[in-house]
A protein has these predicted regions:
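Positively charged, low-complexity intrinsically disordered leader regions
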Residues: 1-33
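Short acidic, glycine/serine/threonine-rich loops at helix termini
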Residues: 76-80, 121-127, 219-225
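Well-ordered mid-protein domain cores that form the structural environment of catalytic cofactors
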Residues: 59, 63-76, 83-107
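Conserved nucleotide- and phosphate/pyrophosphate-binding catalytic cores
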Residues: 200-408
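N-terminal catalytic cores of NTP/NDP-binding nucleotidyl/phosphoryl-transfer enzymes
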Residues: 21-78, 180-187
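Acidic/polar active-site rim loop that often engages polyanionic ligands
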Residues: 73-84, 171-175, 225
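Divalent-metal (Mg2+/Mn2+/Ca2+)-assisted nucleotide/phosphate chemistry catalytic cores
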Residues: 10, 88-96, 100-209, 214-216
């Protein structure tokens, strides 16, 4: 399968600036770039689909460059509804360093920073050398600008698209970049760069956008209860990422396999058939989790996440290490435990049971487990010998309600 055909089959092409791009991707070796502004010191899983296409294009012989917007990050891409909050120079510099390291470590990309070529351009030079080529009416026709005109848009935000156009022209001059790839929300910024090069009598530049990856409810992939899933495993553990991916809706999982993995067309179609025959096995979800986590963090991290999941499901808490327990129970209710606290007091004081009578009922019914083992003695006391790693005790009520007790 040729490059463009592969991208189309995977649903990775939304808009292209010229029909010529298909032939160029299939038969030439292009240098292209993908950019991100440093709003945080780590990429999140939503970036993953965008940057994975760069790796995919590289496998077809094209050369990727990642641009981290040390300059544009100081301005902020206009949001559809309101002005974006500016971040400090110190934050931007810290975030640039984090993203640059991550791009090298995960994707192996060459990284450039647009602050390097914008920092010495004066306002006069910017307006004379670049601003004179872009008509205001052209900028007003951008969708994002149209949406903001009624509520108001600052000149700072208005000029953002011209700064990104400057990036494209500069990357072409310095690195031979002829293609920008981005999410569909960046189409207006891509076309500004193409127009700027044309007006400056430069070479023809090309753009391609990808559809946003959405879940079954139309929410952007990677958004979970308002929290981002980070590619930095110190911010989002492999187990947390595993849980997110393994719970992918059946309606979306094949689409995700196409867009977020390097599995072949034949392999994905085989998985799809098995998923239809036995949806309860969730073979597609496990395949997705394995491919994504292994790519980001390695096979060992995937196996670790899988082990935590299996042990938690089976109740084999004692087979888990302290670190695995902390990963697996990061979001469950936790509380302090004192030496020789009675089991009944532990349940009542921490709202696991509403009263001592209810606590006794839970215990006698076998509904309470400590570190995976049922406790049926009402007089049981919990001492530090129960503490896994000398720190934590895992309490379960019923089949799914977990709590984490921490010895102090």
């Amino acid at each position: 399968m040729k490059c463009f055909e592969d991208l189309k089959w995977r649903g990775l092409v939304k808009d292209i600036s010229s029909p010529e791009l298909e032939d160029k991707l299939n038969n030439e070796k292009l240098t292209f770039y993908i950019g991100t502004d440093p709003t945080a010191d780590s990429m999140h899983i939503g970036h993953f689909s965008s940057f994975l296409i760069a790796t995919r294009l590289a496998k077809y012989g094209h050369k990727p460059i990642l641009l981290v917007g040390g300059a544009t990050g100081l301005i902020g891409d206009p949001k559809p509804s309101q002005e974006r909050k500016m971040i400090t120079r110190e934050e931007v510099n810290k975030n640039v360093a984090g993203l640059t390291k991550q791009a090298h470590d995960i994707f192996g990309f060459d990284v450039v920073n647009n602050y390097d070529w914008t920092k010495d351009i004066s306002v006069i030079d910017f307006l004379r050398d670049y601003g004179k080529y872009i008509n205001v009416n052209y900028m007003l026709d951008k969708d994002i600008i149209k949406r903001r005109l009624e509520s108001g848009i600052t000149f700072c935000e208005f000029a953002y698209t011209l700064l990104q156009g400057l990036d494209f022209v500069t990357l072409n001059k310095n690195y031979g970049v002829t293609l920008q790839v981005a999410g569909s929300d960046q189409w207006g910024n891509i076309t500004t760069g193409i127009e700027l090069s044309r007006k400056m009598e430069g070479p023809e530049l090309f753009g391609m956008t990808m559809p946003l990856v959405l879940d079954a409810n139309g929410v952007k992939f990677g958004k979970t209860e308002g929290n981002a899933l980070w590619l930095d495993k110190n911010k989002t553990s492999s187990y947390e990422l595993f849980q997110y991916l393994i719970n992918t809706d059946d309606a979306c999982v094949i689409d995700y396999l196409k867009k977020l993995t390097f599995l072949s067309k034949e392999k994905i179609e085989s998985i799809e058939e098995k998923q239809k025959e036995h949806p309860e096995d969730r073979i597609a979800q496990y395949s997705l989790a394995r491919e994504v986590i292994t790519f980001l963090h390695g096979e060992e991290e995937y196996n670790k996440a899988l082990k935590i999941s299996k042990d938690l499901f089976s109740g084999d808490i004692k087979d888990l290490t302290l670190d695995e327990i902390k990963d697996g129970f990061k979001d469950v209710p936790s509380f302090d435990i004192t030496e020789n606290m009675t089991l009944i007091d532990l349940l009542v004081n921490n709202n696991i049971a509403s009263s001592k009578r209810e606590a006794r009922e839970f215990i006698s019914a076998g509904s309470i487990s400590i570190n995976g083992e049922k406790e049926t003695e009402e007089t049981k006391t919990i001492d530090s010998s129960y503490a896994i790693g000398g720190e934590v005790v895992v309490i379960r009520r019923g089949k799914k309600k977990y709590y984490l007790g921490i010895f102090k």
